């Protein structure tokens, strides 16, 4: 990953005798003038003053600017009379109209408390542009950001270079940028209408884990401030007539909109959304004002768009803000209280790289990170660099390497690869109690130290640090330093966590909500996102591949996603215009080792367990006589007589097909008992030859070696149960028998895919490589993978072994036809399999081998996004968790429950829970 020098010579003042040159000059000049005009002895105070300044500077090189800001926030000492600490009211009581009917009594003296509205610079709202008191124009974008956790370093650097290009492009324009990363509590759940006790209980308990205490939301905002007027021009502008000011302001707004169009285009890769006016219940609200209001109080709340001066009603929902030396107490109008502390950079790292501050996003802390940057014109930047270099040299500063870095900075500036600007950084940390905020702030300082920054808690100019979060409060930004545009691009990075899409997906809402490592929600969907509203479209790809070793949580994940998918069986989730008889959903789960048996029973499904050697209840001749069924039946019977690689002659195939057609056309469905025996009766081929067609087919006749598989009286493989929408089929014994597994898999899949008639359809196949290793079966799956989306269905394939999966003839096609690939942990995964077969990048492969299987994290790889997520099942309860994955110790007992035909659903579920609870 590319790194860039921090040019630390610009982040600290030039020192002489251990004292910053500028305050040293003013002190010496002050006592020099005093000695001239008052008394020569006054100059003697210079030496002790310098020594004191030197001692102070050892603590903090920027202390004199902080002390200056502290003086700016000095207030009437009488204001502390009631609250005992510096307190700012949300409104100025001295401005309130005075009622002459009452005597002037000031028992509390609230009118002496300063109000913080003077630090709110916002004056007027013009659409999606805010105009400040000093006629600066502000526009704000919320950005999703770019994924970074498993991205290629080259791609990450390209995004950084785009930001660098953006900042370089505006050096000739009077604009500034504020970037905010706001981590706030978030509470969310998806509405589901399950007609099932188990699913309702599982869903409710699962979403209990998404309360505000457990879930966060990372919100990224970029604000551009356009300052068309300099200080002198501003003074003149205020004296102009209203007509002239309105005319000029309209011109500034027009220019601002042009700038905004350019910025929006530059931010396209970061998925920006411009904040502005929106309607709710016929009333205008402003998302831009909601963001500025958040910066005041730390909570997002709806804010109406009003014609009133913005600083008069933007108060963050606060009543007062109380400042001590290093902490704040935010007192809300509803009586709630929160505490906050601020953290600043005292010193920087030697180098920066894209996403250097990403580690902060993983902290379980509510915070607001503010980073402002005011680009300087190239000439001004060069003059500043030269001046700072001269100061360091003339002051005989010992930072020789920093002087050399400034020479490099001048070269890069001359080459046009970077620009420079004034930068400031702060993190405001929130907590519910003073102890809580102290603990979290210390953790924040520690994390920044681990990254390489020297961070400190703001305790000198805390009010300035807090109010400097507000875009356009340029004058009170503490610890203002010059850094390069590449440094700023790396520090802000605009890295975010993919969030999926909550609604307007192919089937409506997201399937479920997962959690990213930062605690933010990820709205999971099988279907791709094609348009802004995909609801009701039935040709969107959703095939999914799930890869994870044993113990990584693959079975639990697949079963949980199946359970959540069951909410789409409810008729209210379909398009209103769809006929009632089309509002259907049917799901299948092809199981291995009966790991899903308990879950299928619990969700009210039908679980078919097939034991090797026992009659399966399969009779493929019981299907309707349609051209497609006849084609598939011929394929199946041909598979039976060529299982060892035999090749049928043209005559043999003709005779076999004729026998099949004779049975299908000459017998009614109910008369086709023991279908293979009937075919043998109509087969004209002579059986005298060794390994003849007849002798090979006779192996599958009732009473012979494989007669139990297909030559049965009736066909019990039907899915026409009125109240059942989910079917599970265990193929453990059948798949273990290489002589029959291909034919059995073909028949089961044939009957399953018969239901892809436009209804919502999903087929989950665990250990898919075992089900589809036969070439004929693989070809059928290949065809379905390509066409099933047009029938409103999709296939979810799961596998433990990428190596085994790679041996499937259609493995490359499956990858190509998958809308999503879910990669779970596999410390033993081989690069040639993950990168060669699954086409993962090096970073994605490293995620698979370096992730702890016990963490149950997985990578979601889709065409338009990548996300690391997990299912947090800590709240679902021990019993529900066990149901999601049946372990071997329970299989025998659960099979007894499943085979007991006298039990209804409630009794089965009760027996199942009782079994797990007793363990």
Regions found by a protein language model. Give the residues of each.
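Conserved P-loop NTPase motor module
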Residues: 658, 662-735, 739-758, 848-919
């Amino acid at each position: 990953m590319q790194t860039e020098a921090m040019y630390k010579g610009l982040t600290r003042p030039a020192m002489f005798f251990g004292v910053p040159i500028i305050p040293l000059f003013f002190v010496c000049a002050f006592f020099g003038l005093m000695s001239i005009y008052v008394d020569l002895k006054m100059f003697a105070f210079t030496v002790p003053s310098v020594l004191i300044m030197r001692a102070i500077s050892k603590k903090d090189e920027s202390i004199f600017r902080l002390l200056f800001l502290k003086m700016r926030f000095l207030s009437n000492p009488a204001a502390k009379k009631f609250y005992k600490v510096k307190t700012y009211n949300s409104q100025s009581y001295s401005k309130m109209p005075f009622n002459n009917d009452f005597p002037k009594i000031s028992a509390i003296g609230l009118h002496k408390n300063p109000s913080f509205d003077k630090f709110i610079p916002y004056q007027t709202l013009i659409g999606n542009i805010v105009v400040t008191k000093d006629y600066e124009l502000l526009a704000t974008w919320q950005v999703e950001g770019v994924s970074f956790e498993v991205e290629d370093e080259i791609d990450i650097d390209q995004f950084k270079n785009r930001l660098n290009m953006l900042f370089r492009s505006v050096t000739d324009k009077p604009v500034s940028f504020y970037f905010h990363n706001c981590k706030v509590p978030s509470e969310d759940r998806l509405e589901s209408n399950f007609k099932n006790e188990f699913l309702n209980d599982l869903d409710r308990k699962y979403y209990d884990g998404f309360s505000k205490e457990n879930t966060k939301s990372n919100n990224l905002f970029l604000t551009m401030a356009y300052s068309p007027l300099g200080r002198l021009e501003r003074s003149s502008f205020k004296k102009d007539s209203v007509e002239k000011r309105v005319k000029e302001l309209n011109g500034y707004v027009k220019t601002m909109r042009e700038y905004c169009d350019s910025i929006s285009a530059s931010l396209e890769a970061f998925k920006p959304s411009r904040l502005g006016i929106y309607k709710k219940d016929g009333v205008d609200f402003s998302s831009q004002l909601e963001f500025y209001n958040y910066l005041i109080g730390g909570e997002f709340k709806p804010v109406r768009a009003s014609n009133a001066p913005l600083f008069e009603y933007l108060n963050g929902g606060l009543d007062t803000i109380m400042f001590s030396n290093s902490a704040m107490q935010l007192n809300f109008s509803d009586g709630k209280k929160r505490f906050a502390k601020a953290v600043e950079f005292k010193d920087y790292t030697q180098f920066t790289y894209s996403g250097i501050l990403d580690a902060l996003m993983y902290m379980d802390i509510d915070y607001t990170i503010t980073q402002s940057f005011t680009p300087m014109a190239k000439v001004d930047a060069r003059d500043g660099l030269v001046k700072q270099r001269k100061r360091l040299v003339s002051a005989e500063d010992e930072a020789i390497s920093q002087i050399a870095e400034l020479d490099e900075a001048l070269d890069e500036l001359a080459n046009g690869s970077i620009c420079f600007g004034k930068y400031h950084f702060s993190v405001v940390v929130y907590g519910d109690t003073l102890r809580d905020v102290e603990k979290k702030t210390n953790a924040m300082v520690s994390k920044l130290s681990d990254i390489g920054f020297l961070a400190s808690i703001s305790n000198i100019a805390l009010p300035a640090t807090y109010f400097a979060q507000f875009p356009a409060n340029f004058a009170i930004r503490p610890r203002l330093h010059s850094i390069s545009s590449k440094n700023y691009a790396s520090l802000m990075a605009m890295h975010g966590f993919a969030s999926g899409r909550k609604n307007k997906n192919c089937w409506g809402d997201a399937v479920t909500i997962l959690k990213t490592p930062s605690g933010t929600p990820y709205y999971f969907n099988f279907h791709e996102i094609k348009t802004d509203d995909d609801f009701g479209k039935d040709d969107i790809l959703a095939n999914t591949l799930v890869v994870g070793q044993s113990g990584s949580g693959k079975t639990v994940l697949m079963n949980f996603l199946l359970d959540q998918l069951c909410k789409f069986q409810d008729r209210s989730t379909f398009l209103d215009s769809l006929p009632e008889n089309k509002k259907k959903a049917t799901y299948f789960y092809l199981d291995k080792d009966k790991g899903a048996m308990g879950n299928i029973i619990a969700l009210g499904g039908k679980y078919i367990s097939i034991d090797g050697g026992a009659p399966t209840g399969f009779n493929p001749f019981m299907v309707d006589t349609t051209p497609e069924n006849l084609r598939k039946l011929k394929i199946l019977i041909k598979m039976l007589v060529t299982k060892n690689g035999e090749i049928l002659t043209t005559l043999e195939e003709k005779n076999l097909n004729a026998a099949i057609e004779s049975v299908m056309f000459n017998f009614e469905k109910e008369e086709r008992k023991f279908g293979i025996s009937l075919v043998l009766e109509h087969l004209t081929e002579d059986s005298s030859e060794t390994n003849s067609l007849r002798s090979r087919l006779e192996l599958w006749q009732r009473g012979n070696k494989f007669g139990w598989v297909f030559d049965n009286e009736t066909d019990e493989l039907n899915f026409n149960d009125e109240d059942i929408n989910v079917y599970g089929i265990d193929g453990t014994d059948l798949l273990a028998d290489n002589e029959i597994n291909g034919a059995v898999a073909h028949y089961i899949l044939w009957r399953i895919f018969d239901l892809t008639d436009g209804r919502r359809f999903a087929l989950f196949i665990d250990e898919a490589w075992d089900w589809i290793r036969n070439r004929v079966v693989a070809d059928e799956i290949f065809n379905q993978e390509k066409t099933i989306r047009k029938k409103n269905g999709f296939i979810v394939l799961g596998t433990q072994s990428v190596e085994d999966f790679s041996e499937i003839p259609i493995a490359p096609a499956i990858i190509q036809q998958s809308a999503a690939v879910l990669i779970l942990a596999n410390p033993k995964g081989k690069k040639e399999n993950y990168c060669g077969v699954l086409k993962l990048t090096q970073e994605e492969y490293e995620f698979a081998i370096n992730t702890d299987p016990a963490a149950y994290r997985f990578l979601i790889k889709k065409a338009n996004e990548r996300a690391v997520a997990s299912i947090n099942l800590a709240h679902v309860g021990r019993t529900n968790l066990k149901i999601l994955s049946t372990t071997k110790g329970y299989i025998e007992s659960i099979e007894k429950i499943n085979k007991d035909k006298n039990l209804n659903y409630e009794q089965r579920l009760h027996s199942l829970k009782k079994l797990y609870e007793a363990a």
